[in-house]
Amino acid sequence: MPTASMTPNPFLSGSPEHAAAAGPLAAFAALPTGMQLAFAIVLGLVVGSFINVVVHRLPIMMKRAWLAEIAEATGAPCADDGLPARYNLCVPRSACPHCGHALRAWENVPVLSYIALRGRCRHCRTPIGARYPLIELASGALAAGALALFGPSGAALAAFGLCAALLAMSAIDMQTGFLPDSLTLPLLWAGLCVNLWGTFASLRAAVIGAIAGYLFLWCILWLFKLLRGIEGIGYGDLKLLAALGAWLGWEALPQVVLIAAVAGAAVGLVATWRGRMRFEEPLPFGPFLAAGGAATLFFGTPFYLLLGG
């Protein structure tokens, strides 16, 4: 919950009464509720389309950087991956990963282009993964949820930013098994900055949350290593929980961890029972931490009480 502050909180100034301070947010707040909701959904869909770019390209960019470092250290030539030399989140244009067909503007419209193309590349007819429209729809729903919960305010934008980052990291973790520092660490600092004004937690609770989130899973990691001789959790998960602590405060961490643990155990057991994975096979924990963080952001303590807290 936002805490009182002696200085104006720019993240909570979206109501018409704060027109002078809010600027564009005040104008947005004056729009009919239906228009606000429609705008939020469209914004969420567009951001979801960009999240798909991040999920696809960021692991490739990181692999390139690792290989370049290895080549520099060993003097060996870097293997050619067949991609342009200039490859980042902005260039080159989006293209089919199978045939290289550069997508036109209408082929990049979130969700609608997937429906129009019937889930296949227009050029080579290779199926397009369902991940793309699902992430776009999830992003649109999260944007609408943030607006409904926090109203037309900076807090809603910040909440959606958190959810968008969690969505991107979850997809990357499920795809690759790791959480990039280039996402977890900026998310941690962003949480501390947002809570300078006590937007979601006091600054004190946010700092303690960042420290406690990291140390808690660090202890679990080393306890597991002492008992089993292996690391049962990745360091990216430590940084993600630290980031959630920075956003939501230390008081939210038990609920986040409980939701993540219960959801992870349930999914793992069902997947093992159905033969989708072996019992000893590692299951990415990042998506469950992200789900716990999003659930805590949107539902707060009552959600924890429903679980028996």
Curated annotation (Swiss-Prot):
It catalyses: Typically cleaves a -Gly-|-Phe- bond to release an N-terminal, basic peptide of 5-8 residues from type IV prepilin, and then N-methylates the new N-terminal amino group, the methyl donor being S-adenosyl-L-methionine. Its EC number is 3.4.23.43, 2.1.1.-. It is a multi-pass membrane protein. Zinc is required for the N-terminal methylation of the mature pilin, but not for signal peptide cleavage. The chain crosses the membrane at residues 35-55, 147-167, 183-203, 207-227, 230-250, 253-273, 288-308. It comes from the Bacteria. PANTHER family: PREPILIN LEADER PEPTIDASE_N-METHYLTRANSFERASE-RELATED (PTHR30487:SF0), TYPE 4 PREPILIN-LIKE PROTEINS LEADER PEPTIDE-PROCESSING ENZYME (PTHR30487). Belongs to the peptidase A24 family. This is Prepilin leader peptidase/N-methyltransferase. It comes from Burkholderia pseudomallei (strain K96243).
